Amino acid sequence: MLKNIPIPSPLSPVEGILIKRKTLERYFSIERLEQQAHQRAKRILREAEEEAKTLRMYAYQEGYEQGMIDALQQVAAYLTDNQTMAWKWMEKIQIYARELFSAAVDHPETLLTVLDEWLRDFDKPEGQLFLTLPVNAKKDHQKLMVLLMENWPGTFNLKYHQEQRFIMSCGDQIAEFSPEQFVETAVGVIKHHLDELPQDCRTISDNAINALIDEWKTKTQAEVIR
């Protein structure tokens, strides 16, 4: 400190000018105060900068959180819309499948194919074959007669009815094909597999949202550590 510094003369030369000791002590005292003031000001500025940085960090974090919340809400709404869309597509696919199968069983070649398979699988005894077909198959009567004569060695009786069923019998053997039942069964099989689609979409939605939440937590924690 200044009081421990020996000053042999009441006057000290400073840049060739004699300055009294009291004036010199008063000068150094003022200088110390200025230094302390500068140091304190620097400390206050440093603390203010740290506080501002902290406030910016929390403000950014709060804004980031709100941004993530908004994003999550939008993603959730989007994925929910996708689930709704999945249900609509399921209904459309079932309608399309029903139309497709109905058109297939109504096609003349389908009747001929079914009869051809039946005739091949039936035992061919000497008994008479009875065949009852939908009346709309009458337009293919000639083709049916050729098919029966080529594949059935015995006699046969062919008639038509107003129902949609194909019925063929010989002795104790009988076969029946219902286009309506076939269509319903086929559509039911497709529906069974499609029923898993909304659940798959829901699982994807949950996984996507959880992944976004995890990412948000990771980034938020990283900002806090900084």
UniProtKB/Swiss-Prot annotation:
Name the record gives this protein: SPI-1 type 3 secretion system stator protein
Superkingdom of this protein's organism: Bacteria
Major place of residence: cytoplasm
UniProt key word Metal-binding: no
A cellular component term, taken from the record's GO annotations: cytoplasm
Keyword Mitochondrion: no
Phenotypic effect of disruption: Deletion of the gene disrupts proper SpaO/SctQ localization.
Subunit structure: The core secretion machinery of the T3SS is composed of approximately 20 different proteins, including cytoplasmic components, a base, an export apparatus and a needle. This subunit is part of the cytosolic complex. Interacts directly with InvC/SctN1 (T3SS-1 ATPase) and SpaO/SctQ (the major sorting platform component). Forms homodimers.
Task of the protein: Component of the type III secretion system (T3SS), also called injectisome, which is used to inject bacterial effector proteins into eukaryotic host cells. Acts as a regulator of the InvC/SctN1 ATPase activity. Required for invasion and secretion.
Stored NCBIfam families: PRK15322.1 (NF011850)
Places the protein is found: Cytoplasm
Alphabetical UniProt keywords: Cytoplasm, Protein transport, Transport, Virulence
One of the protein's GO biological processes: protein transport
Gene behind this protein: sctL1
